[in-house]
């Protein structure tokens, strides 16, 4: 899937699903190494957090893009871009396709995690196990995004939303909006602690509108996603990215939203079940391992 994809367009438990591309030019090239053809359907080529260096795709790979957006076609740095109706274009491809060799085997799903470490991966696993049928995930937890595809896969259309540009603070108010647009469905807002602080006042709107949103705060004590950028700036770590002593439950209660804090694996399931069953907004602050 394209980097920073804002919705789910492929079932993530399908045997041919191989995850999302990172929003990093060098990592994209490494991930796509060995590909004869890169086929991009309805997505840009490609979106990055920062521009990066070197080629955009492996040197021995061909690229074909099908898009209904002429602007996306003009921005594509390599390959052939075709502006077309996607339904008609994909239909024509399927009618003409005849693979000449067997695709390589794909890695299997990771094993189930035990209840011994409260990591973001364990949290995602338990959300996947306990989420109500038909629920919608609105995500702004960038440092946990790659783990989501293994431990919290999206299986249905209209079940996942996030910000395509990586904008800061989008997730919390977006979850309120999705709940208003999809009445009767459970909305789960998966938010990093840093992301949530950009728009924490959205909890007041959730309380006033009485929307059934479960706000899950992945509290790792800082802007962990930014730490990955440090090498690009010639630094070991970035200053000003730690967020100690935040009390999200107190912030929630001050705005009329019930809050519960989870610090141990054994507390997690009960907190999630309570929040998923509530008819009003609930915030669950999960204090995960800093480097888990």
Region locations from a protein language model:
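A short alpha/beta connector and helix-capping loop motif
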Residues: 84-90, 201-219
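Short gly/pro/ser/thr-enriched loop/turn and capping motifs at secondary-structure boundaries
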Residues: 6-11, 46-47, 70-74, 90, ...
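Conserved thiamine diphosphate
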Residues: 20, 34, 99, 230-271
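Active-site diphosphate/adenylate-binding microenvironment
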Residues: 12, 105-179, 184, 234
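DG-centered beta-turn motif at the end of beta-strands
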Residues: 185-205, 218
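Phosphate/pyrophosphate-binding active-site segments
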Residues: 59-145, 265-278, 282-292
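Glycine-rich, anion-gripping cofactor-binding loops and their flanking helix/strand elements
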Residues: 1-64, 155-184, 198-201, 232, ...
């Amino acid at each position: 899937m394209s980097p920073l994809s804002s919705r789910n367009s492929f079932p993530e438990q399908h045997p041919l699903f191989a995850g999302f591309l990172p929003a990093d030019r060098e990592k994209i090239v490494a991930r796509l190494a060995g590909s004869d053809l890169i086929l991009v359907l309805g997505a840009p080529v490609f979106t990055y957090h920062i521009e990066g260096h070197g080629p955009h795709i492996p040197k021995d790979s061909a690229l074909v893009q099908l898009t209904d957006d002429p602007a996306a076609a003009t921005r594509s740095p390599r390959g052939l871009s075709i502006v077309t109706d996607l339904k008609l274009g994909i239909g024509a491809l399927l009618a003409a396709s005849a693979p000449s060799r067997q695709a390589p085997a794909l890695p299997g799903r990771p094993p189930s995690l035990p209840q011994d470490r409260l990591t973001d991966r364990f949290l995602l696993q338990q959300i996947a196990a306990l989420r109500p049928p038909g629920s919608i995930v609105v995500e702004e937890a960038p440092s946990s995004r790659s783990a989501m595809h293994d431990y919290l896969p999206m299986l249905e259309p209209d079940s996942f939303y996030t910000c395509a540009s990586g904008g800061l603070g989008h997730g919390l108010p977006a979850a309120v909006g999705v709940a208003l647009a999809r009445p009767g469905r459970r909305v789960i807002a998966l938010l990093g602690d840093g992301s949530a602080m950009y728009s924490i006042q959205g909890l007041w709107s959730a309380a006033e509108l009485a929307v059934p949103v479960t706000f899950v705060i992945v509290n790792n004590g800082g802007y962990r996603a930014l730490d990955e950028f440090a090498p690009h700036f010639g630094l070991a770590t970035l200053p000003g990215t730690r967020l100690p002593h935040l009390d999200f439950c107190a912030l929630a209660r001050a705005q009329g939203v019930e809050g519960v804090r989870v610090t141990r694996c054994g507390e997690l399931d009960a907190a999630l079940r309570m929040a998923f069953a509530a008819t009003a907004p609930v915030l669950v602050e999960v204090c995960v391992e800093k480097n888990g």
